[in-house]
């Protein structure tokens, strides 16, 4: 529908679905939706490239590299000669650096929603013919799904930071919102230094951390939106207990949450 937005129709044994994704700098997203959007009279070039290659393709694998804000779709399709080919559609949800990138099976970029030349980024070009490289955003962080409560305490205690910042700067995939939620559940002030708390208090924080990670590993999610009156403030796939003065509404799926949140933000 837009230059930085895609709406894919997916067909499977359980019916048809629409997958909406956007690389908007202000509101990047990806979610399943029942809503169709009116297509422009002239489709964006990137959309035409995708139609040419994967209009009748089959998604064979969907995965997230580590805890990165990236989702990869591996797709197989038949080319004009009837040969089986493989492509990868990648969405990177990284604020103003968000992008949707389409590559060959060997990682060569075919095209992207946003082309990034060397004049814009000397670190990472995103242009047809270039090799795709994953953004180096989480390399120095720990995987939170493999850390126990004692390791957690050792890691954050080594940083002269506030509780919240020590958490989200140490572990991949943990946002300031989640870090604040962990502090709240443990009864700690997210903005106080880690050094202000005793070892036992930090162990209690570590226990809350591991409990949350167990919920994530076992797909125990609580999709919700936090509103101040009618204004959406936050959304999350985990239960948020830190907003006692605001309205927290739970929903059946994270896709429902995302569609509501972004539609309300845009009105």
What is the role of each PLM region?
Residues 1-267:
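Extended, highly charged segments
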């Amino acid at each position: 529908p837009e230059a930085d937005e895609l709406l894919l129709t997916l067909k499977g044994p359980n019916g048809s679905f629409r997958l909406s994704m956007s690389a908007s700098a202000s509101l990047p997203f990806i979610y399943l939706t029942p809503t169709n959007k009116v297509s422009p009279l002239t489709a964006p070039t990137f959309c035409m490239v995708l139609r040419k290659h994967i209009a009748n393709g089959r998604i064979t694998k969907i995965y997230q590299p580590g805890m990165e804000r990236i989702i990869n779709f591996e797709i197989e399709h038949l080319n004009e000669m009837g040969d089986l080919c493989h492509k990868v559609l990648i969405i990177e949800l990284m604020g103003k650096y968000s992008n949707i990138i389409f590559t060959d099976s060997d990682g060569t970029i075919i095209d992207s929603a946003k082309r990034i030349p060397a004049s814009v980024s000397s670190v990472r070009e995103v242009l047809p013919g270039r090799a795709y490289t994953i953004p180096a955003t989480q390399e120095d962080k720990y995987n939170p799904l493999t850390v126990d409560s004692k390791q957690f305490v050792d890691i954050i205690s080594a940083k002269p930071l506030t509780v919240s910042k020590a958490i989200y700067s140490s572990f991949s995939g943990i946002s300031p919102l989640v870090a604040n939620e962990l502090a709240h559940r443990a009864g700690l002030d997210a903005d106080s230094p880690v050094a202000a708390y005793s070892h036992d208090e930090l162990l209690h924080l570590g226990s809350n951390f591991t409990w949350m990670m167990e919920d994530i590993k076992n797909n125990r999610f609580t999709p919700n939106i936090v509103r101040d009156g009618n204004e959406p403030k936050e959304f999350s796939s985990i239960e948020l207990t830190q907003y006692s003065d605001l309205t927290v509404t739970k929903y059946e799926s994270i896709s429902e949450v995302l569609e509501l949140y972004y539609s309300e933000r845009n009105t």
